[in-house]
From Swiss-Prot:
GO terms for molecular function: ATP binding; serine-tRNA ligase activity. Homodimer. The tRNA molecule binds across the dimer. It is found in: Cytoplasm. This is Serine--tRNA ligase. Pathway: Aminoacyl-tRNA biosynthesis; selenocysteinyl-tRNA(Sec) biosynthesis; L-seryl-tRNA(Sec) from L-serine and tRNA(Sec): step 1/1. It catalyses: tRNA(Ser) + L-serine + ATP = L-seryl-tRNA(Ser) + AMP + diphosphate + H(+); tRNA(Sec) + L-serine + ATP = L-seryl-tRNA(Sec) + AMP + diphosphate + H(+). One of its GO terms (cellular component) is cytoplasm. Catalyzes the attachment of serine to tRNA(Ser). Is also able to aminoacylate tRNA(Sec) with serine, to form the misacylated tRNA L-seryl-tRNA(Sec), which will be further converted into selenocysteinyl-tRNA(Sec). Its EC number is 6.1.1.11. Its main location: cytoplasm.
Length: 429
């Protein structure tokens, strides 16, 4: 959520910055709401002054010799009228404040200056590449053909029988590799990158989703649970992990906070009809290892570079070629101020496909969820900056391994880094 004071002072500059996203900020609507708020505040102040004046009259009447009960009775009607009007104005002011908050909740984050202009993913800018795409001495198969031919392997038919489209069943060595990837990623981030592993609920309330920016704008992308309580299946571990700091003041000596977490993720993919309908690239349920950081404001830009490097390290250890792109304004996520996508090479498609997004949200999420830290220089609470990134999406990493490590006999070589997690298994057959 944007700072309302910044909107009042620099509305035109913010409007210009948001245009990089293709978003038009309605400053007239904001000005009208803010004027209503001021009017309600002024009316409340006037009524409070009237009440104070009426109460003072009671004292003056008593001083003039009137009995206490008689003095109170004389101004009772006036006080009652004032109190009734004051209650109405307080309720009106709250309604206006709620309206302003909803207006602010619907405004995306301001892109950083480094974010390139552009409309969609075609305008994203490549930053760097690592590794050389493998040239296979045979026609590469896609991960579906490879996985379905493995012993056990992938089974989309039974998954559809259970749950419909965009689900998968894995068994045998493939299921073990999927689990091995999760353990491998968590170990690297915990042991080498200094993240604290956390376990969180997979169901959250609406306020948690509002805090990170999924609600109210993206309700159609979520799975909501039917029952007495309003709960949602998490679309990413970002939601519960970032909200660990909601309504808290973090002490400076506990900063930065770095968390890594494995969760299943659930998405309706409402806007993805017809895209990646084959295989595991885009599913309603998938696993992800997430990185979340909460840092001092002056540290967040450097933290994004480090976090992105931590995600890249997984691909490097697995020897999977990839590239990093910076997202243009039109492709930037709603809550993000700057995002790097990491894209892994898929031989069957002869292109790079997204496997991770790493974002700096600055104080956009922390203002929504009131996540603060105590600045030792001022002694006052200030908003933290939040960041997160996929490190990595487990299913897509599995897809990349199947395709990049495939052999002409249909088997798949197990990457050396994973073999300790696979009981020494060197090949899936």
């Amino acid at each position: 959520m944007l700072d309302i004071r910044a909107l009042r002072q620099d509305g035109e500059a913010i409007k210009a910055a948001l245009s990089k996203r293709g978003y038009t900020l309605d400053l007239e609507e904001f000005a009208a709401l803010d004027a209503k708020r001021k009017q309600a505040d002024m009316r409340s102040q006037e009524l409070q002054a009237d009440r104070k004046k009426a109460s003072k009259q009671v004292g003056e009447l008593i001083k003039s010799g009137m009995a206490v009960d008689e003095a109170k009775a004389q101004v009772a009607d006036a006080l009652q009228t004032i109190d009734t009007e004051l209650d109405k104005e307080v309720a009106s002011a709250k309604a206006i404040q709620d309206e302003i908050r909803e207006y602010l909740m619907g405004i995306p984050n301001v892109p950083q200056e480094a974010v390139p202009a552009g409309n969609d993913e075609d305008d994203n800018v490549e930053v760097r590449r690592w590794g050389t795409p493998k040239t296979l001495p045979f026609e590469p198969k896609d991960h579906v053909d490879i996985g379905e031919a493995l012993e056990g392997g992938l089974d989309f038919e039974r998954a559809a029988k259970l749950s419909g489209a965009r689900f998968a069943v894995m068994s045998g060595g493939l299921a073990r590799m999927h689990r091995a990837l999760i353990d491998f990623m968590l170990d690297i981030h915990s042991d080498e990158h200094g993240y604290q592993e956390v376990y969180v609920p997979f169901l959250v309330g609406p306020e948690a989703l509002r805090g990170t920016g999924q609600l109210p704008k993206f309700a159609e992308d979520l799975f909501k649970i039917e029952g007495e309580r309003e709960l949602y299946l998490i679309p990413t571990a970002e939601v519960p992990v970032t909200n660990l700091a909601a309504d808290e003041i973090l002490e400076a000596n506990t900063m930065p906070r770095r968390y890594t977490c494995h969760t299943p993720c659930f998405r309706s993919e409402a806007g993805s009809h017809g895209r990646d309908t084959r295989g595991m690239i885009r599913q309603h349920q998938f696993e992800k290892v997430e990185l979340v950081q909460m840092v001092r404001p002056e540290e967040s830009d450097a933290a994004l570079e480090a976090l992105t490097g931590h995600a890249e390290a997984i691909l490097q250890k697995l020897d999977l070629p990839y590239r990093v792109v910076i997202l243009c304004g039109g492709d930037l996520g709603f809550s993000s101020s700057k995002t790097y996508d990491i894209e892994v090479w898929l031989p069957s498609q002869q292109c790079y496909r997204e496997i991770s997004s790493c974002s700096n949200f600055r104080d956009y999420q922390s203002r929504r969820m009131q996540a603060r830290w105590r600045n030792p220089e001022t002694g006052k609470p200030e908003l933290v900056h939040t960041l997160n990134g996929s490190a990595l999406a487990v299913g897509r990493t599995l897809v990349a391994i199947l395709e990049n490590y495939q052999n002409d006999d249909g088997s798949v070589t197990v990457p050396e880094a994973l073999r300790p997690y696979m009981r020494g298994l060197e090949r899936l057959k």
